[in-house]
């Protein structure tokens, strides 16, 4: 497990996270865009891939999210995350800005918060 991964997310919830990314009306893709969204406080949920190399690219994101009070979670594959974000390449991280279905995202965030404890 990568240094920056603070908790394990079950495959079922990882699939829900990828579905939420695919359904979201507005997202930010990549470590730089996600970092800006978190710093500005506009991210509703941050999803980070576990297989990012070098790890330093996204290692700051969990700490930044905790500092700003923004929920975050992990998915196993940057390829899957990129595909869910509508890219043909991998994505190290994605921030959901406008969720589309707010109630569905709220339930997903609650599941993620339970995992963190």
From Swiss-Prot:
- Which keywords appear in this protein's UniProt record, sorted alphabetically? Cytoplasm, Ribonucleoprotein, Ribosomal protein, RNA-binding, rRNA-binding, tRNA processing
Q: What is its main location?
A: cytoplasm
Where does the sequence pass through the membrane? none
SUPFAM superfamilies per UniProt: L30e-like
Q: Which GO terms describe its biological process?
A: box C/D snoRNP assembly; ribosome biogenesis; translation; tRNA 5'-leader removal
State the disulfide connectivity. none
Query: Any idea where this protein resides?
Result: Cytoplasm
Check the record and name the Pfam families matching this protein: Ribosomal_L7Ae
Q: Which domain of life is it from?
A: Archaea
PROSITE patterns for the chain:
RIBOSOMAL_L7AE
What InterPro entries does the annotation carry?
A: eL8/uL1-like, Ribosomal_eL30-like_sf, Ribosomal_eL8-like_CS, Ribosomal_eL8/eL30/eS12/Gad45, Ribosomal_eL8/Nhp2, Ribosomal_eL8_arc
Any single Gene Ontology cellular-component annotation: box C/D methylation guide snoRNP complex
Q: Name one GO molecular function term.
A: structural constituent of ribosome
Q: Which family does it belong to?
A: Belongs to the eukaryotic ribosomal protein eL8 family.
Q: Which HAMAP family match?
A: Ribosomal_eL8
Classification via PANTHER family: RIBOSOMAL PROTEIN L7AE FAMILY MEMBER
Q: How does it assemble?
A: Part of the 50S ribosomal subunit. Probably part of the RNase P complex.
Q: What is the role of this chain?
A: Multifunctional RNA-binding protein that recognizes the K-turn motif in ribosomal RNA, the RNA component of RNase P, box H/ACA, box C/D and box C'/D' sRNAs.
Quote the protein name from its UniProt record. Answer: Large ribosomal subunit protein eL8
Q: Species lineage, top-down?
A: Archaea, Methanobacteriati, Methanobacteriota, Methanomada group, Methanococci
């Amino acid at each position: 497990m990568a240094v920056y991964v603070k908790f394990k997310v079950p495959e079922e919830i990882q699939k829900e996270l990828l579905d939420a990314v695919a359904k979201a009306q507005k997202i930010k893709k990549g470590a730089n865009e996600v970092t800006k969204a978190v710093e500005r406080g506009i991210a509703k949920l941050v999803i980070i891939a576990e297989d990012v190399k070098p790890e330093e690219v996204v290692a700051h994101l969990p700490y930044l999210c905790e500092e700003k009070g923004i929920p975050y979670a992990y998915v196993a594959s940057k390829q899957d995350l990129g595909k869910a974000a509508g890219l043909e390449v991998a994505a190290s991280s994605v921030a959901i800005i406008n969720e589309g279905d707010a109630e569905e995202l709220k339930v997903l965030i609650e599941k993620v918060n339970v995992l963190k404890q």
